[in-house]
Amino acid sequence: MKADHTQVTRLLKTARGQIDGILKMVEEDRYCLEVSSQIMAAQSILKKANRMVLKAHM
């Protein structure tokens, strides 16, 4: 079974966009809980992409 490259790529690009947004939030000295919330969202997307890749490996 191969990972759906399109879906994994989309997830990774979404995470990259979120991380870019997080960097901007940090530079703007935004409220720490807002930053933390966005970090957790990015982690969730990365975990999902990782699960897809690992599932395809099995």
Label each region the model flagged.
Residues 1-58:
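Solvent-exposed interaction patches of small proteins and small membrane subunits
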